[in-house]
Amino acid sequence: MHKASTSSANRANFQGNHKTQKSPNNGKAKAKKSPNTDINVADVEMLLNPRSNLTKEQKERRKMMEGFVTKTFERAENESDGSDIDTSASTSNKGKSKAARPTDRKRRLQAEDSPPADANNNNTKNGKDGKVSKESASTQGASATKRKPPRSQGLEHTSPIQVDGEALACPLVRKSLPAAGASGASGPAKSCPLPEKRKSLPAGAAKSKSQVIKQEALEEASNEAQLLALPIETHKTDSIEEGRRVLQWLLNPIKVNHFFDDFWEHTAFVVQRKNPHYYSKLISFKMIDEMLVRHRLDFTINVDVTTYKNGKRETLNPEGRALPPVVWGLYSEGCSIRILNPSTYLVGLRQVCSIMQEFFHCLVGANVYLTPPNSQGFAPHYDDIEAFVIQVEGRKRWRLYEPPSGSDQLCRNSSSNFDQEQLGEPILDEVLEAGDLLYFPRGTVHQAITEEEQHSLHITLSVYQQQAYVNLLEKLMPIVLKKAIKQSVALRRGLPLHTFHVLGEAQRANRSDSRNQLVENVQKLVTKHLMPSAQDIDEAVDQLAKKFQHEALPPIILPEEQVRTVFGSRSTADEQGNAICDYEFDTKTSVRLLRANILRLVTEEDGSVRIYHHVDNGFEYCKYEPIFMEILPEEAAAVELLISAYPYYLTVGQMPLDSAARKVEVVTALWERGLLMTEKPFK
């Protein structure tokens, strides 16, 4: 390569006979020094050795030499046409950055020369703040220093991380962490083997299994407006349509209808926007730091620390709280950080999830993944969710593969880890940049790795977990069977005495008439008595909906909604100490449900009627037991009317109850539980 030949020539010039060359003018006039003779070095090998004890002057010379070599490489690359010219097997490495070697050498020498306070390499690169580019020796080649099992949580030689020019609260952990380049490896630092360059797919394969959609960059203000702009009268909006609006913002430029017709559950795609700020309001490096400082997040419960090296995935979670210095120390060692429930602490992300769950009628979960440069945190695997990968910062290369078998397509459970040898050709191989979106269906095998000098921060939104027909049938068939047992004597009759002798795995080769007769009888019983009715299906769907009410995030109450709900109510006391409420209903008061899916009306097996809701759910997954209120059977008609009328308002007098007092009583009870909203504020 150009880099190798240039380096050899320079090295030869430095190592000659150490005699000062005469100028072209025979010493009469001092010739201008050339770049190759500007640095007079006594012993280049000593200067290149990071363990050498150098004087101040020698350190300055080493910096000069390093700067010269780096400029030489940059000049050589600028003169090239951008392609790799592989002329030396010892310097070629397929898939690596062309500037990997000089950049790594520069980083190693800077780490050796810098004082301890700068050992974190917090300097910004290319004018961009917040890019953590340091790689510890534990992430370098085969001779790298091995990480010791006990991990210190103490601090030595720390300095704050800089983001947007501000020092964050957490210093990087330096105790027990080796300096970059200490291993002495000659190649670039690696936390895992770089993947081979992508191979071309068979004709038509990429089109049938994945697509890449490019969107022209829009103005940043217009992008934010699509998400943040609310209707003038938010108390009159339809929460399902609001969920569609947020999904449309997520998918742009793909239309929601197009998405469900052409991609949903069968085809992966990437949206490339060239707009790094498209999702930047949802999360950032600085937000994660603030989250760790302000809240108690525990390893394993809220935070996972993972690595994937040499084909092996490891979880390296310490015990206890995920304190910022510990998290960033592990991150600086090359570990990936996964935050399991960020919507608990980030209001903007929680709002996106809570609005989208109205559209999907299921929990919308979110995980955050922060990966250092040239790292992979997870082995190839597939998940049991429809995944929307939102790239917020940096870059990450994603490779998707077909489900291993037909039974893995639209899988019900996530897989174990796959070996690289088990994977075929990728159906999609793309690098996500900030502002890009990747969607893939459940059962799609995937893996992702960051690039040299590029970290990655992305959010994975997950929907439709355990939301398939089979989940409905699991609820439905026990209901059908239980009713059929009561109604059919044939199902309650005893089995023939010879059943065990003609049926079973050991009897599969049995072709007797008695065996065939028994098989036919069982099939007839199922066909005749286990066909579900519409009422049975309704009951089963209610059971699934109860599960959603238990899992769902609580709604975020907007200011215009707050003054119309119990959450904006304030009570006072009179002179005698009696509580005085600031609201009062009458038959002319107009009300509606707070959200389309805020409640579920369910008749239980014992005949009781309950309203399950998620108004008071916690931010953590299923933090509380299912929340419900019990009503009288005759009051269910009023709730059914409110459900069918949404998003429109009804007056209290329109409730199908026998008296005005009863109507006011029922509506007041629902409003006080946070389930209803009035058209006009009481104040």
Swiss-Prot record:
Q: Where is the composition biased (Low complexity)?
A: 116-125, 179-189
Indicate where this protein resides in the cell. Answer: Nucleus
Q: Give me the stretches of Polar residues compositional bias.
A: 1-26, 85-94
Q: Which family does it belong to?
A: Belongs to the ROX family. NO66 subfamily.
Q: Name one GO biological process term.
A: behavioral response to ethanol
Q: What is its EC number?
A: 1.14.11.-, 1.14.11.27
Record-given protein name: Bifunctional lysine-specific demethylase and histidyl-hydroxylase NO66
- One cellular component GO annotation, for this chain's record? nucleolus
- Listed as disulfide-bonded, the cysteine pairs are none
**All residue ranges annotated as the JmjC domain in the record:** 341-480
Look up and give the organism this protein is from: Drosophila yakuba (Fruit fly)
What keywords tag this UniProt record?
Chromatin regulator, Dioxygenase, Iron, Metal-binding, Nucleus, Oxidoreductase, Phosphoprotein, Repressor, Transcription, Transcription regulation
Q: Which residues bind Fe cation?
A: H381, D383, H446
Note one Pfam family from the annotation.
JmjC_2
Compositional bias segments (type: Basic and acidic residues):
54-65
Q: Which GO terms describe its molecular function?
A: 2-oxoglutarate-dependent dioxygenase activity; histone H3K36 demethylase activity; histone H3K36me/H3K36me2 demethylase activity; histone H3K4me/H3K4me2/H3K4me3 demethylase activity; iron ion binding
Q: What does this protein do?
A: Oxygenase that can act as both a histone lysine demethylase and a ribosomal histidine hydroxylase. Specifically demethylates 'Lys-4' (H3K4me) and 'Lys-36' (H3K36me) of histone H3, thereby playing a central role in histone code.
Q: How is the cofactor bound?
A: Binds 1 Fe(2+) ion per subunit.
* Reactions performed catalytically: N(6),N(6)-dimethyl-L-lysyl(36)-[histone H3] + 2 2-oxoglutarate + 2 O2 = L-lysyl(36)-[histone H3] + 2 formaldehyde + 2 succinate + 2 CO2
